[in-house]
Amino acid sequence: MPRLTLTGTNIDAPDANALADFYRRLLGWTTRAEEPGWVIIQAADGGGGRLSFQTESRYVRPVWPAGPGDQQMMMHLEIAVDDLEASVAHAVAQGATLAGFQPQEDVRVCLDPAGHPFCLFLQ
């Protein structure tokens, strides 16, 4: 089998730079590369993977949880935390919103500024 290497995850947004800036502040990461409509961020030490963001002119904000006919989420990020409530407060201070529906006690679903859900969970 040929060697295949996953190098990151690309997230569509109406404004790649704005969404990359949100996740950069949320995670404490740095910008690795930036071009008009495209940004890569990663941990300052180079570990933890990478997230790429691209501007999509026809971006449709997902609805979570989705109902019939709603734009569904395509993926979500799982972010381990050591203090759930402090991490939620940090996420909200950076521009996230707490989702109205919370399916588990030890997980908090938040929405980034472009509407993508992400989960904060105790590890």
Question: Model regions: which residues?
Answer:
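Short, conserved charged micro-motifs
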Residues: 18, 84-89
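Conserved active-site tyrosine of GNAT-family acetyltransferases
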Residues: 23-24, 91, 115
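Short, low-order "capping/linker" segments at domain edges
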Residues: 117-123
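Vicinal oxygen chelate
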Residues: 2-7, 29-76, 88-112, 123
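Short N-terminal helix-initiation segments at or just after the protein's N-terminus
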Residues: 14-28, 60-61
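A generic "binding-loop/recognition-motif" signal
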Residues: 15, 37, 84
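Conserved Rossmann-like nucleotide-cofactor binding loop
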Residues: 82, 116
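N-terminal beta-strand motif that seeds the catalytic metal site of vicinal oxygen chelate
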Residues: 1-21, 74-81, 121
